[in-house]
Each structure stands twice: as structure tokens, then as C-alpha cells.
Amino acid sequence: MLVIHRRIDPQPVWAAELHLTFEARSKSRLRCFSAEGEDVGLFLERGQPPLYDGECLQAEDGRIVRVCARPEQLLHVTCANAFELTRAAYHLGNRHVALQVGDGWLRLLDDYVLKAMLEQLGAQVESIEAPFQPEHGAYGGGHHHSRHGDEDFNYAPKLHQFGVRL
């Protein structure tokens, strides 16, 4: 079994690929198979953002493994104007839906209830198959691998500091 504990920056060369759905890329513990058919065990640090398409991992034996977002069933949402698209995004955000935001479109995992809601709001909704790379969200925090310049990423949380008055 190829055992992986480390996330690393993207590399120009890799020995294997993992084709994973968004749900699988969100797990810190996972048993899966590489595209080459090798048994893989992921044992990543808990509490980190999901793996992203193109990110690399380093196995215990030193091999580099590239993460690929596997195509999955999505809803591709467009609207007649920016106001309607913003309204659709607001309603999806209110439901804490994982959402990929593009220039003039939104994408979310296929869900017939959300599709009906979006159509009721006047959005055009198309079922597609594509890789899914949603936003990390307001509480996702910074993501980096380098230890150089850590002070640049040491942001104190400002939301929900109850009892603190400035």
C-alpha cells in the first residue's frame, strides 16, 4: 500500500495520480486506488481544507502523487443578470451548499431540490459532468505549505470575538 501523510506544493513531475471526487478530497483519512491501480492510504492532518485539483502529495517512500478532481454530476447555474445570479448564490449560501463560483456562473453538486429552488428563482440550470472545485468558505483559512514567511499567514480571527469591544 502506498501510504501518504504529506501535502506538498504542485510539482512538475509525479509518479502516480489520484482521481477523487470532492467528497473524497475532503477526507483526511481515505483508502482508495491510484489511476495506476495501486492501493493508497491517505493519513493527512485533520482540519485542513480539501485537496485541490493539481495539488501534490508525498508518499512515505518519497514518490510524488498528483491529485486530480474527478468529474462528477453537477448543476451549472446561469442567470439573466448579475442581480439574479447574486440572489441565487445568496439562497445557496443560506443553505451552506458547497459552491464553485465562475465568471457568470455557479456550480454545485447535483440535487433535485436545489435545482427546483433555483429554477423557481428564474435561474437556468443545466446538469453537467465536470470536476468540482468549490470555494473554501468564510472559515476555510489560508492554505500554504511553505514555512518561509509564516508571519504573513498568521492572521488573528476577527469574526465572532464575543465580548471584545474596540
Curated annotation (Swiss-Prot):
One of its GO terms (cellular component) is cytoplasm. Its main location: cytoplasm. It is found in: Cytoplasm. One of its GO terms (molecular function) is unfolded protein binding. Belongs to the UreE family. HAMAP family: UreE. NCBIfam families: PRK13261.1-1, PRK13261.1-5. This is Urease accessory protein UreE. It comes from Pseudomonas fluorescens (strain Pf0-1). The lineage of its organism: Bacteria, Pseudomonadati, Pseudomonadota, Gammaproteobacteria, Pseudomonadales.
